[in-house]
Amino acid sequence: MISINMTIENAEWGDEKILYTITEKALIATIDRLSLTQVTSELSLLFTNNMRMAQINTQWRNKNKPTNVLSFPAFPLKAGQNPGPMLGDIVLARETIVYEAEEEGKSFHDHLTHMIVHGILHLLGYDHETDDEAYQMEELEKEILQKIAIKNPYTELL
């Protein structure tokens, strides 16, 4: 079992129980798909705003701007490896996720779930630096999200 620790820095995120439920659903679907249900680990999430995300992005990636999600693995993993006792940290920026959801015609909760799945996959060693890696990661995301009744996030709006 992977335990979830959450820090909510911004009241605009709303109800902590709803955020926990979304996170738990994303985590369970991801670990089920990757056959990691027997793993014991810990996941931390920071729900913050664009200003704080820009600070973190500058500090760790030298990019002075907010982004939707950042992942910080506790231990470097290759895709398919079992995680250690601490999976890592995921940071989410509310304003960016709200903006993207509106621009892409998605519900906020569906897009947030996608960003959490995306972050978890990064912590588990998946990446999108090459076309092959991006394809593999996107396919996993689509499969995981489909299991929890969320449409393909990569479908273009017409």
From Swiss-Prot:
It is found in: Cytoplasm. It comes from the Bacteria. One of its GO terms (molecular function) is RNA endonuclease activity. GO terms for cellular component: cytoplasm. Keywords: Cytoplasm, Endonuclease, Hydrolase, Metal-binding, Nuclease, Ribosome biogenesis, rRNA processing, Zinc. Its EC number is 3.1.-.-. Transmembrane segments: none annotated. Binds 1 zinc ion. Its cofactor is Zn(2+). Pfam families: YbeY. Gene3D superfamilies: Metalloproteases ('zincins'), catalytic domain. InterPro entries: MetalPrtase_cat_dom_sf_prd, YbeY, YbeY_CS. Signal peptide: none annotated. Single strand-specific metallo-endoribonuclease involved in late-stage 70S ribosome quality control and in maturation of the 3' terminus of the 16S rRNA. HAMAP family: Endoribonucl_YbeY (MF_00009). This is Endoribonuclease YbeY. The lineage of its organism: Bacteria, Pseudomonadati, Pseudomonadota, Alphaproteobacteria, Hyphomicrobiales. The gene is ybeY.
